[in-house]
């Protein structure tokens, strides 16, 4: 009986950390890898790469825990989230807080093996991860904070490799914020009706009937910034082909969301994993060439 209870609790923690849904971790991982490859340039040191890959998964899990903790009073009123561990009672509030602290502590232990500049930047990463889930109560732009949280690994990666945060770093950071606003608006379009009922704010609500147009403008800006980064770093034509492929994926996403159906919007959101992957492959091949 004790093993059954323990097993159920571990499964609940597993769901709370979203380890069964890796899309969020992947959307956090790709910009991190972009930054490491550009900052090096090429293949980064194995230990630095390992620290950032592990840190991505740990902090994404921590972000999911604090997000569900912040939304625990709302999730029970939304069909898609009603069965999450906190509103369903599978995990207590105290257990969620403890799990968050453990995940953050493990992440910080990894960062302590890097240089001082990276350690100091990690404090801001923690603040962004904690603040983001609460922003949707006060502003229609929580996706901007999400983009900053998901992109803060970019200056950390540059700092870890070169102890500097050059122009390319901040252009990539900006590109990631715009990308995150675009894809998380697609995600928010799935829950727009429910969010309106319970008073949750989002860019999907703010943009209203202009949502598709604004997403398109953001996507074009992302492509322009990534092309500029390629030019500043002297990357080869293979990289620019990857930017074009990413653009084709954005066009496909626009076709998906044209009718604003929930499943299609979610599919468009998920497709962004391929955008991140394609851009990383373009970077990697450019440095190999």
Curated annotation (Swiss-Prot):
GO biological process, one term: ubiquinone biosynthetic process
Membrane topology classification: Multi-pass membrane protein
Family as reported in the entry's similarity comment: Belongs to the UbiA prenyltransferase family.
Cofactor annotation: Mg(2+)
TM ranges: 23-43, 46-66, 99-119, 141-161, 163-183, 213-233, 234-254, 268-288
Localization in the cell: Cell inner membrane
Domain of life: Bacteria
Signal peptide: none
CDD domains: PT_UbiA_COQ2
Chief localisation class: membrane
Gene3D superfamilies: UbiA prenyltransferase
Pathway the protein acts in: Cofactor biosynthesis; ubiquinone biosynthesis
Catalytic reaction annotation: all-trans-octaprenyl diphosphate + 4-hydroxybenzoate = 4-hydroxy-3-(all-trans-octaprenyl)benzoate + diphosphate
Function, in words: Catalyzes the prenylation of para-hydroxybenzoate (PHB) with an all-trans polyprenyl group. Mediates the second step in the final reaction sequence of ubiquinone-8 (UQ-8) biosynthesis, which is the condensation of the polyisoprenoid side chain with PHB, generating the first membrane-bound Q intermediate 3-octaprenyl-4-hydroxybenzoate.
UniProt name for this protein: 4-hydroxybenzoate octaprenyltransferase
GO molecular function: 4-hydroxybenzoate polyprenyltransferase activity
Cellular component GO terms, alphabetical: plasma membrane
EC code(s) of this entry: 2.5.1.39
PROSITE patterns registered for this protein in UniProt: UBIA (PS00943)
Database matches in NCBIfam families: ubiA_proteo (TIGR01474)
Keyword terms of this UniProt record: Cell inner membrane, Cell membrane, Magnesium, Membrane, Transferase, Transmembrane, Transmembrane helix, Ubiquinone biosynthesis
Coiled coil: none
